[in-house]
Curated annotation (Swiss-Prot):
Organism: Danio rerio
Source taxonomy: Eukaryota, Metazoa, Chordata, Craniata, Vertebrata
Top-level taxon: Eukaryota
Protein name in the entry: Vang-like protein 2
Gene name of the record: vangl2
Amino acid composition bias (Basic residues), ranges on this chain: 15-33
Membrane topology field: Multi-pass membrane protein
Length: 526
C-alpha cells in the first residue's frame, strides 16, 4: 500500500503538465496493472536507495514540462552508476601526468655537465701528477717559480670550482623539448679545449718524456686560464644576455581571457615559454572552470515557443504556409531579453556573495573570541580555576565547528569548494592560531582569490605543458611571433612585440626664466 500511495503522488504531480490527458490515461492503465500484479507493477515506477527520499528537490516543484518533455527528459538508469563523466577523465589524466616519472629528464643535463666539468677540473692536476709518477728522477728541478705557479693554479681552480657549481650544477626546474643551444655550445667548447690540450700533452710531454717541469706547470696553468675565459663567456650567454628587455610578451588565457604583459630579453621560444610559465603560477589567478558557465536560466531559454507542422493535403498547404511564415516573422521580431536576465543574475549573485561573506566574517570573528593564548604566568597565577589547555591543532578543531557551515556556504556560492578541503582549512586555521594572526588574516585566503601557486599540492610535481609553435622552438623571439602553451583544459597564447625605439631629445631651460606676476582683481584678498 505504501508503494501504491507513492505512485499515486507521483502520478498527481505528472497530471499538471500540458499533456495531462495522455498522462491520465497512462496513470489509469498503470493503476489497474498495479491492482492485478501487486508489487511488480509498483517497482516499475521508480527505484530509490534505502534511506533516500522518494522525491528530490526538483520533483517537489511544479511540473513545468513543455510539449517536448518526452524528448528532453533525462532518464537515470542502472548503467549510470558506472558511467564516467568528462570531468572524471580530465581529473584522471591530470593524476597520470603528476605521477609520470620526470626525474631522469630533469637531472640528465646537470649530470652530464657535472661529469664534463669534473673532468676539466681534474685535467690540470693530472698534467702535474703524471710526470711525477712516471719519470720523476729525470725531471729538472723547479724551485720558487714553480711554487708561485702552484699557488696561482690552486686559487684559479678554487674559483673555477665554485663558479662552475653556482652556474652549471643548479637543479633544473623544467624540461625543454629541445636542447639549449648555448649550453650545448659551451659544453662542446669545453670538451674541444680539454681534448686538444690532452692531445698536445700526449704528443709533446708524455711521448718524449719532457724533462722541463716548469714548462709542464705553465702548460697546466694555461689550461686553467682558458677554462676561466670559457666560464666568463658562459656567464654572458646564459645569465647576462637576456637581462636587457627587448620584447614585450602578451599572455592571454584562452578560457576566461585573463592576460598579463611581460618584458623579456633575447630568448629562444622554449626559454621564453619557461619564463612565462614561471610567472604564470605567481601572477595569474587560479583557473576556475565553474565561473565560466552562464546562469542556467539563460542557457535553458527557448528562442521560439511554438512549432509549425504541415499535416494537411496539398490544397490546404497554402493557408498553413502563410500562417507559419507570419508566426515565424513575429517570433524573429520578438526582442531577446537574455542580456537583461544575465544582468539580474549577476546582480543576484553579487548580493548572495556579499551576504555569505558577511555571515562568514561574523562567524569567524565570534569563533576567534572563544580562544585565548595562555601565558605561563597566567597558568601559574590561577591554579584554583583550571581550564582545558589545548594545542594549536585541538584549538583549531574546536573553533572550526561554529564557522564550518558559514564557510561551506560561502565557498559553495563563490565556487571555491574544489580548492579548499576541510583538512586544508583546519591546517590553515592552526597556522593562523600558532602565529597569533587575526580573523582577517585567516580569511584573506578565502575572500581574495590567490595565484595559481597557492592552490598547488605541496608534494605534486610540475604540470605537463605542450609548446605549440609554427617556428622551431630553438629560434629566437622576433616581431609578430605567436606561440601557445597548452594543457588539457586551457591554453596560454603568447604574442611577441618588440619594444619601441626611444628617441630622447633635450631642451634647456634657464633657471632665471622662472618669473611670475600676480594678477590682482577687486575680489582678491592680499
Amino acid at each position: 500500500m505504501d508503494n501504491e500511495s507513492q505512485y499515486s503522488g507521483y502520478s498527481y504531480k505528472s497530471s499538471h503538465s500540458r499533456s495531462s490527458r495522455k498522462h491520465r490515461d497512462r496513470r489509469d492503465r498503470h493503476r489497474s496493472k498495479s491492482r492485478d500484479s501487486s508489487s511488480r507493477g509498483d517497482k516499475s515506477v521508480t527505484i530509490q536507495a534505502p534511506g533516500e527520499p522518494l522525491l528530490d528537490a526538483e520533483s517537489t516543484r511544479g511540473d513545468d514540462r513543455d510539449d517536448n518533455w518526452g524528448e528532453t527528459t533525462t532518464v537515470v538508469t542502472g548503467t549510470s552508476e558506472h558511467s564516467v563523466s568528462n570531468e572524471d577523465l580530465t581529473r584522471a589524466s591530470k593524476e597520470l601526468e603528476d605521477s609520470s616519472p620526470l626525474e631522469c629528464r630533469r637531472f640528465a643535463g646537470p649530470i652530464v655537465s657535472g661529469v664534463l666539468g669534473l673532468f676539466a677540473l681534474l685535467t690540470p692536476l693530472a698534467f702535474l701528477l703524471l710526470p711525477q709518477l712516471l719519470w720523476r728522477d729525470s725531471l729538472e728541478p723547479c724551485g720558487t717559480p714553480c711554487e708561485g705557479l702552484y699557488v696561482s693554479l690552486a686559487f684559479k681552480l678554487l674559483v673555477l670550482l665554485i663558479s662552475s657549481w653556482a652556474l652549471f650544477l643548479r637543479p633544473s626546474r623544467s624540461t625543454l623539448p629541445r636542447f639549449f643551444v648555448f649550453r650545448c655550445l659551451l659544453m662542446a667548447l669545453v670538451f674541444l679545449f680539454v681534448a686538444s690540450y690532452w692531445l698536445f700533452y700526449g704528443v709533446r710531454v708524455l711521448e718524449p718524456r719532457e724533462r722541463d717541469y716548469r714548462g709542464i706547470v705553465g702548460y697546466a696553468v694555461s689550461l686553467v686560464d682558458a677554462l676561466l675565459f670559457i666560464q666568463y663567456l658562459a656567464l654572458v650567454l646564459l645569465e647576462v644576455r637576456h637581462l636587457r628587455p627587448a620584447f614585450c610578451l602578451k599572455v592571454v588565457r584562452t578560457t576566461d581571457g585573463a592576460s598579463r604583459f611581460y618584458n623579456v630579453g633575447h630568448l629562444s621560444i622554449q626559454r621564453a615559454a619557461v619564463w612565462v610559465l614561471d610567472h604564470y603560477y605567481t601572477d595569474f589567478p587560479v583557473y576556475n572552470p565553474a565561473l565560466l558557465n552562464l546562469p542556467k536560466s539563460i542557457l535553458s531559454k527557448k528562442m521560439s515557443g511554438f512549432k509549425v507542422y504541415s499535416l494537411g493535403e496539398e490544397n490546404s498547404t497554402n493557408n498553413s504556409t502563410g500562417q507559419s511564415r507570419a508566426m515565424i516573422a513575429a517570433a524573429a521580431r520578438r526582442r531577446d531579453n537574455s542580456h537583461n536576465e544575465y544582468y539580474y543574475e549577476e546582480a543576484e549573485m553579487d548580493r548572495r556573495v556579499r551576504k555569505r561573506k558577511a555571515r562568514l566574517v561574523v562567524a569567524v570573528e565570534e569563533a576567534f573570541t572563544h580562544i585565548k593564548r595562555l601565558q605561563d604566568d597566567e597558568a601559574a597565577a590561577s591554579p584554583k580555576h583550571p581550564r582545558e589547555v589545548m594545542d594549536p591543532r585541538e584549538a583549531a578543531q574546536a573553533i572550526f565547528a561554529p564557522m564550518a557551515r558559514a564557510m561551506q556556504k560561502y565557498l559553495r556560492t563563490t565556487r571555491q569548494q574544489p580548492y579548499h578541503s576541510m583538512e586544508s582549512i583546519i591546517s590553515h586555521l592552526q597556522f593562523c592560531i600558532t602565529h597569533n594572526m587575526t580573523p582577517k588574516a585567516f580569511l584573506e585566503r578565502y575572500l581574495t582569490p590567490g595565484p595559481t601557486m597557492q592552490y598547488q599540492r605541496e608534494n605534486g610535481r610540475g604540470r605537463q605543458w605542450t609548446l605549440v609553435s609554427e617556428e622551431p622552438v630553438t629560434a629566437a623571439l622576433r616581431q609578430g611571433l605567436v606561440f601557445s602553451l597548452r594543457r588539457l583544459d586551457f591554453a596560454l597564447v603568447v604574442t611577441v612585440t618588440p619594444l619601441p625605439f626611444l628617441n630622447l631629445g633635450e631642451e634647456f631651460i634657464d633657471p632665471k626664466s622662472h618669473k611670475f606676476v600676480m594678477r590682482l582683481q577687486s575680489e582678491t584678498s592680499v
